[in-house]
From Swiss-Prot:
Residues 58-90 are annotated as: Disordered. HAMAP family: Ribosomal_uL4_B. This is Large ribosomal subunit protein uL4. PANTHER family: 50S RIBOSOMAL PROTEIN L4, LARGE RIBOSOMAL SUBUNIT PROTEIN UL4M. It comes from the Bacteria. It comes from Syntrophus aciditrophicus (strain SB). GO terms for molecular function: rRNA binding; structural constituent of ribosome. Pfam families: Ribosomal_L4. The keyword Hydrolase does not apply. InterPro entries: Ribosomal_uL4, Ribosomal_uL4-like, Ribosomal_uL4_dom_sf.
Length: 217
């Protein structure tokens, strides 16, 4: 998509298209949100946090108290000439428990809200700078129709794209569900990993101002 930068008022300008790929207007983008300096470090921190949150952490081993059996003392304490032993499930025995093995755990952690906002501004700016940002005037769809949605995707030549809407739209969400490489999110659910994981970012115009309002400060 053709994008240009206006140096008169120091505002970023993007062209706005309808679903037939006709230019209908232009929109000024907030420089602090779509023209920010790209900070690779905060992007890395936030993506790492998101990936950690997706880990299940279900790996587990049995300690000496978890292994079945071993309740009977193998032999008497004294008089056999062998080392004393209280259970056959000791970690030093074959078939015994595991010492310091993995246990179920939660890998989730948080980074400061300010860092998350900074990372989101960085990836939005990255899409704008790389001319991978598409702004649609609207996406009129009054029924669940995957075919119609796919026609728009093909018209813009989108292979892997993230669509951002201002609010919940059942028709758009369900129509895009079975199209490979396409994902639909609401503006409040936009995240760094999804933006990076898709080649194009397609924003429905009303969602632009909502994003700017949430991220400009």
């Amino acid at each position: 998509m053709k994008l240009r930068y206006s140096r008169v008022n120091k505002m970023l300008v993007a062209e706005v298209f309808d679903i037939n790929k006709n230019k209908v207007s232009e929109i000024e983008l907030n420089d602090a949100v779509f023209g920010a300096e790209v900070n690779d470090a905060v992007i890395y921190d936030v993506v790492r946090m998101q990936m950690a949150s997706r880990r299940f952490g279900t790996a587990a081993t049995k300690g000496r108290s978890d292994v079945s059996g071993g309740g009977k003392k193998p032999w008497r304490q004294k008089g056999t000439g062998r080392a004393r032993s209280g259970t056959s499930r000791s970690p030093i025995w074959r078939g015994g428990g595991i010492v310091f093995g993995p246990v179920p755990r939660d890998y989730k952690y948080n980074v400061p809200k300010k860092v998350r906002k900074n990372a989101l501004r960085s990836v939005l700016s990255l899409k704008y700078q790389g001319q991978k940002l598409v702004v649609l005037k609207d996406f009129p769809l009054d029924e669940i129709k995957t075919k119609k949605f796919k026609e728009v995707v093909d018209r813009f030549g989108l292979k892997k794209a993230l669509f951002v809407t201002e609010e919940r739209n059942e028709f758009l969400e369900k129509s895009s569900r079975n199209i490979a490489g396409i994902k639909m999110v609401r503006s409040e659910g936009l995240n760094v990993y999804d933006v990076l994981n898709h080649e194009h970012l397609v924003i429905i115009e009303p969602a632009v101002k909502k994003l700017e309002g949430a991220l400009k400060s």
